[in-house]
Each structure stands twice: as structure tokens, then as C-alpha cells.
Amino acid sequence: MSKRSNFDKIPRDFYPTFDTNATPPSFIREIRGKRYAEPCCGQGDLVDLLYDAAICKWESDIEARGCGYLYDAMCLTKNELQKCDLIITNPPYTRKVVLPMIDHFISLKPTWLLLPADWMHNRYFGPYMDKCSKVISVGRLKWFKDSPHSSTDNYCWYNWRYKATSDVDTVFIGRG
């Protein structure tokens, strides 16, 4: 998960989003009352976290984990998302997987993704930051329920508008 640890990576980047720190008030204000799709839902932890703020109208994952449809996020179309205002997910962090996902998701709906904060400083992510309209800082998160430790990396919610282009000024919201 982290570049500063030597732990083995979990298959398919399955890191459940159960930590309430992943949903700061500034993020909740952005999504309150909206209907959304969670296309990398895993066991539904993020949907549970957002239950009081927004309404999940589509849940799916590429692997059956007891929640939502068994469905590849890269196969989503506007048809599956017709009842959704936006996409919210904690996607896999493998670059060759997530970068095409960003392109695909923003071609369908406005999108919020929980990603490592330092990605915004990397060249490979530059074209995505050029299109990113908002970044909300989250800080360090806990990925393992039985562990007393949080991650060694910081995280952010990144927002892209529907069909975002590279003429966007990014608004940054720190931890308040």
C-alpha cells in the first residue's frame, strides 16, 4: 500500500475504507444529498461511511465480496449510472489500473476518488491534476481494523468534473 513499507501488496488493491477520518466535514458538505455510484465497493465500507450524507444508487466491484454487483468498473456506461449524480470510490492504486479509470469515470459523471496525496506532485499525474477541480485533504488513514497503526502516507479526495478538460483551477481544502 505504501512506498515506505515492505508489506506485501494485497491482491487487487483491496483496502477497505472503514476509517471515519476518510470523510472529513468538507468532503461531506460536497456530497450531501447527492446520489452516487460506488464502482469499487469491496465489502461496502465506504457506502456505510457515507450512509447519512449521500445515497448510493449503484454498488459494484470486480470481485464478489458480498456487496453490490459483480461488475468491472471499466465497463460502466451512462445506463448503469442514470440514477446517479456522481461517482465516489476508493479505487485500486495501481497506476495502470487507476489512471484509465479516472479517464473513464469523468467521461460518465463528476467523480470523487480517494487517492494518495503525494500523487498530485508526480509528473505522471500532471495531466490528471490539470483537470482536477478540487482536492480535499484527509491525512493518514487506517487500512487494517486490527492494527493500532495508521498508514504512512497521506490521502486526499480528488474531484473531477464531468468531461473535465485541462482548463481548470484546482481548489485545495486542507484539514481544518
Indicate residue ranges for each PLM-predicted region:
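Class I S-adenosyl-L-methionine-dependent methyltransferase catalytic core
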Residues: 1-176
